[in-house]
Amino acid sequence: MWKNLDECSLFRDLQEAQIPDLRQCLKGESGANRIERYSIPMAAGMHYNYAAKQVDDTLLSLLQKLADEQQLILKYQRLLSGEEINTGEHRKVLHHLTRGQLGDDVIYNGKNMRTFYLEQQKKVREFSEAIRNGSITAPSGKPFTDVVQIGIGGSDLGPRALYLALKAWGERHNKLKLRAHFISNVDPDDAAAVLSALDLSTTLFILVSKSGTTLETLTNERFVGQFLQEAGLNPAKQMVAVTSESSPLANNPSYLASFYMDDFIGGRYSSTSACGGAVLSLAFGAD
């Protein structure tokens, strides 16, 4: 059932296939036809266009055959049903449930996982709306103007990429309420550069660590906490945690609020969980 790609006969065919020259592929009328054909309609009037990728009909056919050899659709169906797909760590893979449900209910330890993720999204929505409309203010009584996410790896890269991708849209449509910033480097000069450019009295911080023990993230938290205290501010009044329910950060009075994720959502896929949902909802609104 599970076979490495380089063990598949069709993978060798792919390696031997000729890579198309995009400069030639996109020229003239044939290029215009390629742009039209290599486009897939998606939701909200958007399209995924792959005309500028180094593929052609021959490569697409080989990729389809490789997907068939690997039983890709069957494996995807098993992922949707909550079977153990992460064989290395013996875990389910459930990031898709933060976006929608295409399969049957996934129950773990008596808990409906889709319901759990929706509950966390509701908490994030309510909190972000309260921050954005001024119901929850900074300790000074002023509205929060900025949000800083403290994380590393998937807790940083995905949310950061989505924020940068949406920033211009948010500004153009008057959706950007809190400017977002990110601290991941354990070099204190990096964090100091971010913090020195902000009005700390109106800045909210999000600490992201699934285990609650990530050394690099906790090191940055301590640095930020010291920075705030030196400015006469109380970190507990300006910091929220995104973590697991069993983490030492959960329901900790050192944080203004806590939002939860779990081991079934890997870091690189966590942008639509509370990991990315909190900072993006604060910046652009929950919708």
For the regions a protein language model found, what residue spans apply to each?
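Extended, charge-enriched "interface" segments that sit outside catalytic cores
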Residues: 2-140
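Glycine-rich phosphate-binding loops that contact phosphosugars or nucleotide phosphates
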Residues: 126-134, 140-287
